[in-house]
Curated annotation (Swiss-Prot):
GO terms for molecular function: lipid binding. GO terms for biological process: pollen exine formation. This is Non-specific lipid-transfer protein C6. The lineage of its organism: Eukaryota, Viridiplantae, Streptophyta, Embryophyta, Tracheophyta. Belongs to the plant LTP family. Residues 1-27 form the signal peptide.
């Protein structure tokens, strides 16, 4: 049986996390991949457009991002994450999940922060420098 698209996307997130960690602690700390890995449980919600309940662990992961590195939500707003993992993540659905399903409040200025290229958004991941 072939893996589901959600499983494959979670695998891609895991690969990105490992790649960031391979760049050393500094690389992992300056990227959003570790934070966004917390979204893995939410992938079925994005895949099933009729879903009204968050999968187990999804809201806890979102809460961790909102409280820790909310600026990493810009990778959803700017569609960087969906291009990286190949799963459609509509911004309106993501914020409905945050507010209506998980009862979380993203920072009020998150959209303008994301639109401002100088907003200090860490990259999704970074590639380690080649060894000499």
């Amino acid at each position: 049986m072939a893996p589901s698209k959600s499983t494959a996307a979670a695998g891609v997130l895991l690969v990105l996390l490992v790649a960031a960690a391979g760049g050393g602690a500094e690389a992992a700390a300056t990227t959003c991949v570790a934070s966004l890995l917390e979204l893995s449980p939410c992938l079925p919600f994005f895949k099933d457009k009729a879903a009204t309940a968050a999968p187990e662990g999804c809201c806890a992961g979102l809460s961790s991002i909102v409280k820790g590195e909310a600026v990493c939500l810009c990778h959803i707003v700017n569609h960087t994450l969906e291009r990286a993992i190949g799963v459609d993540i509509p911004v309106d659905r993501a914020f409905a999940l945050l507010r209506d399903v998980c009862r979380l409040s993203p920072p009020a200025d998150i959209i303008s922060t994301c639109a401002n290229e100088k907003g200090g958004v860490p990259p999704l991941y970074s590639c380690p420098a080649p060894s000499a």
